[in-house]
Amino acid sequence: MRYPILICLLFIGIFSSCKNKLLIKAGITKGEINEKLIDTSGRTVEKRIACPTSFSRIPAPVGSFTAYLRALPLKPSDEDVLLFDGRSKRVFVHCGVIDMPIRNKDLQQCADSGMRLYAEYLYVKKQYNKISFNFTNGQACAYVNYAEGKRIQFNGNTATWVQKVNEDYGYDTFQDYLDLVYTYAGSFSLSEELKKVAIDSIQPGDLFIHPGFPGHVVIVMDVCKNASTGKRLFLLAQGFTPAQEIEILINMDEGKINPWYSIQYDVIATPQFNFTSDELYRWE
């Protein structure tokens, strides 16, 4: 469900409380971005962003969601985040943009971006039976139903699958399915569908979810660990409103490790939204 007016008000409120933080491209207040951690020539998440001293990325088994996220292609470092209509996003809070085009529809927003990355991973793995997301009313929307030619028919708050077209597991139809999910699922339904996990166990693919109408969602793109202390750091990515490409966020408050985030605070302060440390969720 889309609530552009409410989200706009939320956006204004967040930034009015950040009057001392100037958002500039590839930079922050409270210390510049740690250039030693950024390789502007890197064209994947792993190659673009290095770990801070004494940290190393946690293991990523071949074929895992972690490995998939690390290998996601990035746009050239000098390119902007694009909105769904082709305009540049004028708030620069990123150190990388995932090279994954979005459709010319104001649909793929924050929660949708997290769902898309997970769905894209499962689609590449051909694990079609695992691609399913719940609508806000709690009803499951399985990709295999859509691919088999069934379409949702609504009767009040109830939705049923009705055979309409021929079977098609092609990528365009897969994107049509995701458009349906984006329309009827969101931060609230994700918070009901996923399980909460302790931040000490944070891993790539987890989501910080603040459920609501509107709420917000960011996805954990990678995690590194200090073998001596056990301390973990993580990278975050987001979609936003209006719909935009998925961007890897900078950390405006911890310049020495920017763009990594630490788990030592109760509040996870991203540039455009604050989460609490107990709002971490995981796909089951």
Question: How would you describe each model-predicted region?
Answer:
Residues Y171-S228:
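...with weaker cross-activation on analogous glycine-rich loops/strands in unrelated enzymes
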Residues R232-E284:
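Low-complexity, Gly/Ser/Thr/Pro-rich intrinsically disordered linker/tail segments
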Residues R57, I102-C110, V197-D200, G212:
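Extracytoplasmic/periplasmic, Sec-exported soluble proteins
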Residues N20-P101, Q108:
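Cationic-aromatic interfacial patches
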Residues M1-A26:
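Bacterial Sec-dependent N-terminal signal peptides
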Residues R103-K195:
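Extracellular-facing segments of soluble proteins and assemblies that are Gly/Ser/Thr-biased and enriched
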Residues L107, A111, G205, G215-V218, ...:
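Extracellular structured ligand-interaction cores
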